[in-house]
């Protein structure tokens, strides 16, 4: 927009906010979903649209390389690749796919993991943060981001120390990062605290609404 208006129009980017009152940190063992599923160990979760743009083949390739049986993967959502994920999970003891979950259940299912996976397709950087990221932060979950390091979410992760970055289409690097995170799982508490703090401050609803008010006043 700035380029098209040649600087003649003031442009301000206001992000979405986190639903901090509806979503907050819980131990995964205290969630309804965790107690319904036959899943254990250290859990990485991908929740959201399971489409072609999410780089899911890369994730599945990385999972196939992970040999540590104490690491599990939970996929939640629907989309064009849902049947592929379901079939993959039927072949892997440490992979579970449960399909679409209602948004009203976010507090429960976002907390049914130790680390949340977020992806962003190539060429999408600069267009904002994947919306699910805000409530992942509200749940106090570290983010394993797969995508361009110049993207908004990558910059957010680096600035506030709320997760890790892996370049897309590199299953070996992703596998190594997954294993690194597991090996250093005892140090996650500071990242968890950072995630919730960012949701409570930078992406608090009141703060975002005040920015709209200031802009429109």
Give residue spans per PLM region.
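A charged, aromatic-enriched C-terminal amphipathic alpha-helix characteristic of glycosyltransferases
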Residues: 169, 173, 186-216
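Short donor-sugar binding/catalytic loops of nucleotide-sugar-dependent glycosyltransferases
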Residues: 36, 47-52, 79, 101
């Amino acid at each position: 927009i700035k380029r098209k208006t040649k600087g003649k129009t003031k442009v301000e980017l206001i992000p979405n906010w986190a639903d901090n009152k509806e979503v907050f940190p819980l131990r995964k063992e205290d969630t309804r979903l965790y107690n319904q599923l036959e899943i254990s160990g250290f859990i990485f979760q991908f929740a959201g649209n399971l489409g072609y743009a999410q780089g899911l083949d890369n994730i599945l390739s990385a999972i196939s390389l992970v040999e540590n049986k104490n690491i599990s993967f939970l996929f939640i959502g629907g989309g064009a690749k849902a049947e592929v994920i379901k079939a993959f999970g039927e072949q892997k003891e440490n992979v579970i796919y449960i399909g679409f979950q209602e948004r009203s259940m976010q507090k429960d299912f976002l907390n049914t993991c130790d680390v949340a996976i977020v992806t962003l397709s190539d060429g999408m950087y600069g267009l904002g943060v994947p919306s699910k990221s805000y409530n992942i932060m509200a749940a106090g979950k570290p983010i394993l981001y797969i995508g361009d390091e110049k993207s908004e979410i990558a910059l957010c992760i680096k600035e506030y120390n709320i997760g890790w970055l892996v370049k897309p289409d590199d299953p070996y690097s992703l596998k190594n990062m997954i294993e690194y995170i597991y090996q250093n799982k005892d140090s996650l508490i500071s990242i968890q605290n950072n995630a919730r703090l960012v949701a409570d401050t930078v992406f608090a609803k009141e703060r975002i609404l005040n920015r709209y008010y200031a802009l429109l006043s």
